[in-house]
Amino acid sequence: MRVYRMLRSRVIPVLLMREKGLVKTVKFKEGKYVGDPLNAVKIFNEQEADELTLLDIDASRLGHEPDYVLIERIASECRMPLCYGGGIKTVEQAERILKLGVEKVSLSSAVFENPKIITQLAERVGRQSIVVCLDVKKRLFGSKFDCFTINGTKKQSVDTIEFVKQIQTLGAGEIVLNFIDNDGVMKGYDLDAVSKFKALVKVPLTVVGGAGCVDDIAKLVQQEKLVGAAAGSLFVFKGKYKAVLINYPSPSEKKKALEL
């Protein structure tokens, strides 16, 4: 397996899309409307975000194809690298999305149904364009994590540790760990769990779930030396009453957070 040298750390907003609008969930439930995706992209452009992840959380659940027209509009507006996930089941769908100007595709449900899609896609477009996103939840008893799909509603019958190893062997260029229990809680990342997973990962690793302030990002990056620190609520809410306000750390805040 190829071992990656340390890349520059990135602070990544994660936007959840439902019915062409943006929502923010808590522990993968509910879904508060937080705005229009094109408007959000324009704001993140102005604030010079490192990268942007857009996930259509209804596409796989409802069996929809990706909304190629909207994806193309968003990609054409985006002045930062864009990763898209949601409803991707085939190599052809993934290739079509990449041709729209998207830099990376994020696979989730598809890798459990057909793990070989990772290898097939890597051979066609290169592993650098392939992200595997694992939605993980800690078991009630013990320290093990299970993988879920379909917005956290379908538990997958895989050994999570072994699956993390397998997807790297198959050609995943990046792994995103999305901690379900931390989603929208804004009380910090699960650093102990991140540390255990990081020991298994030889490709770039991004973590999402739990960030409530820039200091949380700093702790994650500085302790675990991760390539990606991602967040949702942190970048769409502001203040103790969580007013909807698209935001991103200032250059000085980000520089301080990413000091290694």
From Swiss-Prot:
Against InterPro entries, the record matches this protein to: Aldolase_TIM, His_biosynth, HisF, IGPS_HisA/HisF, RibuloseP-bd_barrel
User: Per the UniProt entry, what are the Gene Ontology biological process annotations, in alphabetical order?
Assistant: L-histidine biosynthetic process
Could you give one GO CC term from the UniProt record? cytoplasm
Q: Which UniProt keywords apply?
A: Amino-acid biosynthesis, Cytoplasm, Histidine biosynthesis, Lyase
Record field: transmembrane: none
Alphabetical list of SUPFAM superfamilies matching this protein: Ribulose-phoshate binding barrel
Cite the EC number: 4.3.2.10
Q: Which GO terms describe its molecular function?
A: imidazoleglycerol-phosphate synthase activity; lyase activity
What is the predominant subcellular site recorded for this chain? cytoplasm
Query: What top-tier enzyme class does this entry carry?
Result: lyase
Q: Identify the CDD domains for this entry.
A: HisF (cd04731)
Q: Which NCBIfam families match?
A: AglZ_HisF2_fam
Supply the PANTHER family for this chain.
IMIDAZOLE GLYCEROL PHOSPHATE SYNTHASE HISHF, IMIDAZOLE GLYCEROL PHOSPHATE SYNTHASE SUBUNIT HISF/H IGP SYNTHASE SUBUNIT HISF/H
What is the documented function of this protein? IGPS catalyzes the conversion of PRFAR and glutamine to IGP, AICAR and glutamate. The HisF subunit catalyzes the cyclization activity that produces IGP and AICAR from PRFAR using the ammonia provided by the HisH subunit.
The subunit field of the Swiss-Prot or TrEMBL record says: Heterodimer of HisH and HisF.
Name this polypeptide is given: Putative imidazole glycerol phosphate synthase subunit hisF3
| Originating species | Vibrio vulnificus (strain YJ016)
* Organism lineage: Bacteria, Pseudomonadati, Pseudomonadota, Gammaproteobacteria, Vibrionales
Whichever gene encodes this chain, its name is hisF3
